[in-house]
Amino acid sequence: MANFVLKAEKREDLGTGASRRLRRAGKIPAVIYGGEKEAVSVLLDHDKVLHSTEDKAFFSSEITLDIDGKQEKVIIKALQRHPYKVKLIHADFMRV
């Protein structure tokens, strides 16, 4: 079983315009939800996530997100892709 660790940063700017700027800068907006905690908006490096998705185990394995130095165990619930480009648009993670 593969061990997936991704670095993430908390997002302060929310909304469509902010998300577009992040995507142009090579980042993916994402949200982490579930459990007793509030939902958290984060951003991930596009190329690292895209590389991880090439392994089919990514979609069924527990993923460790390193959010500003704090570890969080999650699974991926949704991954939005661009219709014809090899680009990721958004990711949803659920806490384990």
UniProtKB/Swiss-Prot annotation:
One GO biological process this protein is involved in is: translation
Q: Under what name is this protein listed?
A: Large ribosomal subunit protein bL25
The entry's function note states: This is one of the proteins that binds to the 5S RNA in the ribosome where it forms part of the central protuberance.
Quote the PANTHER family the UniProt record gives. RIBOSOMAL PROTEIN L25/GLN-TRNA SYNTHETASE, ANTI-CODON-BINDING DOMAIN-CONTAINING PROTEIN (PTHR33284), RIBOSOMAL PROTEIN L25_GLN-TRNA SYNTHETASE, ANTI-CODON-BINDING DOMAIN-CONTAINING PROTEIN (PTHR33284:SF1)
Organism of origin is Francisella tularensis subsp. tularensis (strain SCHU S4 / Schu 4)
Q: Which family does it belong to?
A: Belongs to the bacterial ribosomal protein bL25 family.
Pfam families listed in its UniProt record: Ribosomal_L25p
Task: Classify the source by domain of life.
Answer: Bacteria
Query: Which Gene Ontology terms cover its molecular function?
Result: 5S rRNA binding; structural constituent of ribosome
- Give the record's subunit note: Part of the 50S ribosomal subunit; part of the 5S rRNA/L5/L18/L25 subcomplex. Contacts the 5S rRNA. Binds to the 5S rRNA independently of L5 and L18.
Q: Which InterPro entries match?
A: Rbsml_bL25/Gln-tRNA_synth_N (IPR020056), Ribosomal_bL25/Gln-tRNA_synth (IPR011035), Ribosomal_bL25_long (IPR001021), Ribosomal_bL25_short (IPR020055), Ribosomal_L25_dom (IPR029751), Ribosomal_uL5_bac-type (IPR020930)
Please name the SUPFAM superfamilies in this protein's record.
Ribosomal protein L25-like
Supply the alphabetized keyword list. Ribonucleoprotein, Ribosomal protein, RNA-binding, rRNA-binding
Cellular-component GO terms for this entry = cytosolic large ribosomal subunit
Q: What is the lineage of its organism?
A: Bacteria, Pseudomonadati, Pseudomonadota, Gammaproteobacteria, Thiotrichales
